[in-house]
Amino acid sequence: SPENCQGESQPCGCYCDAEGQGWPQDAEENGDIVCGEXTPC
């Protein structure tokens, strides 16, 4: 499963996959702005 990369290099909540791409996190769960798909981490 992807790791949470929030607070590392993105200004919004996202999950970072093994290839370093960010995927949106559930905004309702963490209350953060959601990243766009495939945003580089």
Curated annotation (Swiss-Prot):
Disulfide bonds: none annotated. Keywords: Secreted. One of its GO terms (cellular component) is extracellular region. The keyword Secreted applies. It is found in: Secreted. Expressed by the venom gland. This is Phospholipase A2 homolog nigroviriditoxin acidic subunit A.
